[in-house]
UniProtKB/Swiss-Prot annotation:
UniProt main location, coarse: membrane
Modified residues (Cysteine methyl ester): C189
CDD domains listed in its UniProt record: M_R_Ras_like
The protein's name in its UniProt record: Ras-like protein RAS2
Effector region (motif): residue ranges: 37-45
Keyword match Nucleotidyltransferase: no
EC number(s) per entry: 3.6.5.2
Amino acid sequence: MSGDLDRQYKLVVVGGGGVGKSALTIQFIQSHFVQDYDPTIEDSYRKQCVIDDKVAHLDILDTAGQEEFSAMRDEYMRTGEGFLLVFSVTDRSSFDEIPRFHTQILRVKDIEEFPMILVGNKSDLENERTVSTAEAQELGRKLKVSYLESSAKQRINVDAAFHDLVRAIRNANKASVEPLRKKEKSRRCIVL
């Protein structure tokens, strides 16, 4: 149990190009907003924080959104323990790409559900919004993931996105351990 108190989590930030994945990650790690868009190939960050009174060492992979780097996706999808599915509320096509990322993660993991959080970034640009909160919430329900809106620029729900993902990983781990414990307790030896 003590290993669970001080644990490393491999988080992966995925989504289309220009949705603010790097801005979200850098705001979380360094409390700094990156104004200029510089396409990422792949960057890795580390941060230690306390989430629900437990120390968490976060190993965050900020991925390329551009299609030309899609060959790298299977590898980081294999190793990630949880995923932030990021789209921009001002970019309809980035929202439409999310089910493809979700499906690809589940295919690579060969599982029906996995810890993921749907993040609608750039919520500060309300006048440029092309994706409503209601339709994003509906997609979250359909994909069986929770949804939140964030603004890397105004630091709205930045910490919440990463912390909620760690909680989702912890809950998934707890759910997979519970049935094993119940099986162990129910074993009985019958002598005939």
